[in-house]
Amino acid sequence: MTLKDLEIGKTAVVTVVGGEGALRQHFLDMGVIPGVSVTVVKLAPMGDPMELRIHGYELTLRLADAEKILIDESSVTKSDGKREKNTKNVFKENAVTEHPGLGEGGRFHQKADEHPVPKGTVLTFALAGNQNCGKTTLFNQLTGSNQHVGNFPGVTVDSKNGQIRNHPDTLVTDLPGIYSMSPYSSEEIVTREFIIKQKPTGIINIVDATNIERNLYLTMQLLELDVPMVLALNMMDEMRGNGGSVRINKLESMLGIPVVPISAAKNEGITELINHAIHVAQYQEKPSRQDFCDENSHNGAVHRCLHAIMHLIEDHAVRAGIPVRFAASKLVEGDQLVEQALNLEQNEKEMIEHIIVQMEEERGIDRSAAIADMRFSFIQKLCDQTVIKPGESKEHERSRKIDAVLTGRYTALPMFAAIMALVFWLTFGVIGAGLQNVMEIGIDWLTQKTDAVMTLWQVNDVLHSLVIDGIFNGVGSVLSFLPIIVTLFLFLSLLEDSGYMARVAFVMDKPLRKIGLSGRSIVPMLVGFGCTVPGVMATRTLPSARDRKMTIMLTPFMSCTAKLPIYGFFTSVFFPKQSGLIMIGLYFLGIAMGILTAVISRKTMFHGEAVPFVMELPNYRLPGAKNVLQLMWDKAKDFLQRAFTVIFMASLVIWFLQTFGLHLSMVADSKDSILAAVAGAIAPIFAPLGFGDWRICTSLIAGFMAKESVVSTLSVLFGSTKTLLEVLSPLSAASLLVFCLLYTPCIAAISSIKRELGTKWAVGIVLFQCAVAWVAAFVVHLIGMAILALIE
């Protein structure tokens, strides 16, 4: 019987984990090991993937992958759908004993074990932990930085650095969230390469106390790296609030490192954590325990195997700069990257293989499963002695009730459509549009007053034109769209922080698979509605190069907020009564073009299937007001910086080129300017689309630098909407809107694509987007001309 055959609400014991390669290793690292109990919670609305409960947390798995996992049919029982409460752990001592201070208790901070680094050395820390465990929140508390804090696995897609507050000789690096040190995704490779090669003086390992079994799996692998380390036990407020507790001192002694209970969100325990982290790094107090094998389990088969390999490869590991215990574990798992780094001789490889095969025969399961089982067995023993699990937490109970609607069979897709429609309606029709009108009034008033004052003072004509036509008309026209952009980012942030984005990935996996993508691809594309740059960076959470390339190619089709000024400007001038409807239609057109591109690409460039959908579903959490407000401010600040740097400079350059002729003298008519001569050369390319005017062409070129520059350039070149109406018809405006929707993303987005995929892909995407935009705009223009001909 396979896991695929297990009915909803039933629990069974896993007997065999099938599959091969990195995917199977990922299953094992996620806790899907022989002997573990697994419960089927539900199926996605379209019947695939399934949601499982294992080790006390929720995991998603496709049916095709579940079919590779065998279960014991005789072990099938009915589950009540709630997390089990640990009632057997009743400790004599107080389970919430306060963590000992510096110099108190245990082996930690004893001079005999200290090897201090030279004074003045910058203490570098790697902040490592599972995805969605509060890692970036802790980073913000430690450093005062304000990184994006989300509730979706993989928010940190790049490492970020910062000094610990009030400790200038420190540097903390926030690494991508990972589940293990196996090379399944690029994030895991980045994290382990950083720790092994950069050799930080200390590791801060953050663990979610409400999901401690899952999180400690990574902890055990970090301990094998033999780097001074402190464990930050996060979300202890939730743990205690739900009736659970942890024996901190006992946990500390069993792991061999300091353990500090904290609440990153409430800034509790952070000072103590900093003190311990700095101390273990300053005095290089390495973990006192790395060997978690039970010598009595299965006659110590795994224990003897690992120690034999450690003895054999010790010299190689030292030369390669890889901790020997870590190297031995990875060799048993079949990690090719570690094997290559060790540069073993052929006879040594054969000896290692013989040792591993002997262990498999004694243990009764394969090598990778044996290592995973060794770790989870120790974690189970550890938790039995140190953790009192609460019953179903308030957060989990709330999540179950919300999921009944948001991921329900008949309600999930309608709710997703309704939520996105509400976001767009509030952004373009209510909140954002209302605030935009207020800002436009303010900018117009300031422009008129400045113009009047400069006229009264008889300011030089060139300077007058520069300030009014170049700066106010250019930058001011873009600034008025700030409220819409911030509003859209606000709603996207709320969806991400709450945990809903992960559910969208779960719900959309099957339809996305039809076009060759995984459900995880939906998140970079949704982020792309805010900005293409983080959308492209978010693809690093995808483990397959094929999926990353395909998702990056589609992300620019998701209309970013920088294009909103273009839509708002043209719809207000040419289609004032249908403004909101047309803008929403443009968004859906972009999605449709992305789907069409995906379908074609799947049959040409990207053959094969999307990677398996294995993802943890976090509990819903109310977004923190501070986090949301900070994100809004960051986006507003970023927009203002762009407005007064890139857009400001673009406006000045455009003003200069359209004000002066080839002999650098002011021209009476801009058609005699330098700009007209340059842009006129490419204008014929756009003539079939209905907007062959050189000024339009100039604005599109400026849009390559920053999409907001399209509007500022048009404002500078045309001066007034009346002039624009004389040049463009509503049909031409519609064609231009479609072109702006689909043509090449800005230079920042192209740079991020180049960083992820290389120069050839970046250039290819620019040319591809421009070609698609030209064809789509041409089709719109042809259809419009045909309709007008029929009407006449």
Task: Give the residues covered by each predicted segment.
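Canonical P-loop GTPase G-domain recognition
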Residues: 239-292
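Extended helical scaffolds that flank P-loop GTPase cores
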Residues: 283, 290-457, 663-675
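Conserved C-terminal guanine-recognition region of P-loop GTPase G domains, centered on the G4
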Residues: 167, 190-259, 566
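Hydrophobic core segments of alpha-helical transmembrane domains in multi-pass membrane transport
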Residues: 415-426, 488-493, 571-573, 586-600, ...
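Conserved G1/Walker A P-loop phosphate-binding module
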Residues: 97-180
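Juxtamembrane inter-helical linkers in multi-pass membrane proteins
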Residues: 441, 445-449, 502-532, 607-631, ...
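Extended, low-charge hydrophobic alpha-helical regions
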Residues: 369-373, 389, 430-471, 515, ...
